[in-house]
């Protein structure tokens, strides 16, 4: 994806000097080649929450070899870097009023709160869109939402 975007923008990948990645906890583990079994087995604790010191060359990314790679930190087993990045970019952590941030995909994550506190939770959302053994649901296609 990086190479395609750089090509479309007519940018030499060697000029990409920083890479930020926001993915769920399991994808973070797979990206770094870390065993992801702890995420899916009791007590559902990730092998890591954050990972510092990555460079483009470490992940064989099409970017400058020394480009720092910032991996959005995991909050928990099913609340990963994707929801961390969404919470940060939506600025709900800095608001006076109570706010709700929802990320729906195969898993659903919800963050609720304001500058005083934030709480999060996760749930399986895929079956609601895929119709897997439930009476009301459909595939993730036009009209699903």
Which residue stretches match the model-derived regions?
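Alpha/propeptide regions of enzymes that mature by internal proteolysis
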Residues: 1-11, 17, 66-67, 75-80, ...
